Amino acid sequence: MSDDRLIVALDVPNVVQGLALAEKLGDAVSFYKIGLGMLTGGGLALANELKQDHGKRIFLDMKLFDISATVEAAVRGLAQFNLDFLTVHGDPHVVRAAKEGAAGSDTKILAVTILTSLDRTDLDDCLIRDGEMLDLVAERAGRAFEAGADGVISSPHEATMIRALPEAKGRLIVTPGVRPTGSASGDQKRIATPRQAIADGADHIVVGRPIWQHQDPRAAAQMVVADLP
């Protein structure tokens, strides 16, 4: 049986490989993330097929960031695909525009706080102001919630802190950077196990390579689900 707290990242090059992986996973997975890499290889068509023909839930990870009118128009168009989750950057004007675009649909707008592939050194390189990572994430999450975000994307390390924010009541926390015990961290820097991420307050976890690079992806997904509290 699947558990929709697990979202599998379809970080493969094209639709053919994406469908092949989804077929291998079968009913062990009910929720998929499609990111920018897949979008250039027919990702919207894949999202539509998985949603309409296979009954899967879809998280489109686009991290939209533009002027308000452009974000609103883009989200309005994407919402026609009956997406479950859609990501935008957490700037308040972006979140508000995305919510306007998603109005009338069931698409949840999730705001990115700070990418799980970044640490304080990376933020310094990007000229992002000084401060502890936890404080910066809390500030961005709070502003996104105030702007109307249905949830946020954060590393597992910040999930407990975000869950404690008054503004977070009834909102979603989705955590990439989740690695089963013994898995390589890859390009993620702020990571946790599936069990720890959920215990710390995440509603959903995103797992990619530890599943789709496994010799038996279905078994790998089932092991992740078995580890959830």
Curated annotation (Swiss-Prot):
It is an enzyme of class 4 (lyase). Substrate binds at residues 11, 33, 61-70, 116, 179, 188, 208-209. Keywords: Decarboxylase, Lyase, Pyrimidine biosynthesis. Pathway: Pyrimidine metabolism; UMP biosynthesis via de novo pathway; UMP from orotate: step 2/2. SMART domains: OMPdecase. It comes from the Bacteria. Belongs to the OMP decarboxylase family. Type 1 subfamily. Catalyzes the decarboxylation of orotidine 5'-monophosphate (OMP) to uridine 5'-monophosphate (UMP). HAMAP family: OMPdecase_type1_B. This is Orotidine 5'-phosphate decarboxylase. It comes from Jannaschia sp. (strain CCS1).
